[in-house]
Amino acid sequence: RKVPHFEFIDQNRDTITEDTYKGKVFLVEFFFTRCPTICIPMNKNLVHIQNTFKDNPNFGIASFSIDPEHDTPEVLKEYTQSYGITDPDWHLMTGAREEIYELANVGFNLLAQENPNIEGNFQHSGLFALVDQNGFIRSRKDDFGNPLIYYRGFIPQGAPEVEGEETSQIDILMEDINKLLNKNKK
């Protein structure tokens, strides 16, 4: 599945579209800066991934805020500083709520919605999508041959995951990023 068109403003007030990532392998997440739960390990995992691939100009991260009324470019900029987000190809984006929710729920098939009944008042997926250099969402097969389309980003690095799994989803994700980055080097 191809990444749909998007156009939002990032933490530097730059306009970012899917073409910003053209020719790059990149990750997609939906988050919000006031998230009291899964965003914390998700973004710590992404910082770990950022630091692993920091010298590769063909890698990027696209983070879309599901709380755009609060998450202005200034708030997103402060968030980058507090989390150690330094990669110029990691864009934290904000824009029209309806467009962001449409991108999440329809474009990437990842949950994003308001929910006043839970802590933080927003509900969203803790999964990352991996996109290849041609703009296609990529997947791999699990041990049973089923497609693994998304990667669990909400498990803290090094923490036990699902019983019986030997390799963390973040390690698998980094392996898949490496495969895509090295695909054209052969």
Regions found by a protein language model. Give the residues of each.
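Second-shell loop/turn segments in exported
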Residues: 28, 32, 64-66, 90, ...
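Short active-site neighborhood of thiol/selenol oxidoreductases, capturing the structured segment around
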Residues: 16-46, 61-62
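Structural microenvironment flanking redox-active thiols in thiol-disulfide oxidoreductases
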Residues: 43-103
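Thiol-/selenol-based redox modules, centered on thioredoxin-like
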Residues: 118-186
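N-terminal "domain-start" segment that seeds a small globular fold
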Residues: 1-19, 44
